[in-house]
């Protein structure tokens, strides 16, 4: 999985080199964290809890969810989530669905990569636990190499 932060696309490279391309939203401002991560957990209809940093940054928006939010259509993680780890450390970064499809193509999240529900549902079924996710820097573009 590769996220082109400049073009706002996620590429899923399949066996044989065929790639699927999906539009995404990335994190606002300096909250985007480029790097290479491992997808160690996949969840259908995940619950969501804002991180302490999110609550501190925007308490008026997130403090009410400090104890978490159940799965459902208004949950910020949507219908599926892929959990990104750095080694054995949960980064709290996710590739997930979004109940806000209009955000796709922009910078909208607090760190995660957002997809429309239909796209994350399909990607979820195709990506295995242990797969690598590359979140490319916002100032770079992905180029093909021979």
Can you name each region flagged by the protein language model?
Residues 90-91, 97-98, 135, 141-142:
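Short leucine-rich amphipathic alpha-helices used at interfaces
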Residues 95-107:
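Immediate flanking context of iron-sulfur cluster ligation sites
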Residues 78-80, 91, 108-111, 119, ...:
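A short pocket-lining beta-strand/turn micro-motif at the edge of beta-sheets
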Residues 26, 97-99, 127, 139:
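A short beta-strand motif that forms part of the nucleic acid-binding face
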Residues 113-146:
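N-terminal targeting pre-sequences for secretion and organelle import
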Residues 85-87, 98-100, 118, 138:
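Short, loop-centered acidic/histidine patches that primarily coordinate divalent metals
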Residues 1-94, 124, 146:
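Gly/Pro-biased beta-strand-loop elements
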Residues 30, 45, 101, 139-141:
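Short loop/turn segments at secondary-structure transitions that flank enzyme active sites
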């Amino acid at each position: 999985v590769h996220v082109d932060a400049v073009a706002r696309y996620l590429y899923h490279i399949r066996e044989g080199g065929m790639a699927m391309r999906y539009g995404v939203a990335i994190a606002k401002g300096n909250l985007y964290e480029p790097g290479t991560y491992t997808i160690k957990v996949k969840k259908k209809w995940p619950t969501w809890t804002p991180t302490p940093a999110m609550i501190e940054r925007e308490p008026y928006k997130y403090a009410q969810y400090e104890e978490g939010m159940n799965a459902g259509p208004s949950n910020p993680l949507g219908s599926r989530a892929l959990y990104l780890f750095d080694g054995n450390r949960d980064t709290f970064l996710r590739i997930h669905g979004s109940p806000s499809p209009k955000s796709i193509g922009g910078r909208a999240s607090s760190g995660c990569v957002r997809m429309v529900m239909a796209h994350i549902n399909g990607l979820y079924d195709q990506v295995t636990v242990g797969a690598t996710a590359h979140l490319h820097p916002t100032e770079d573009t992905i180029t093909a190499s021979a």
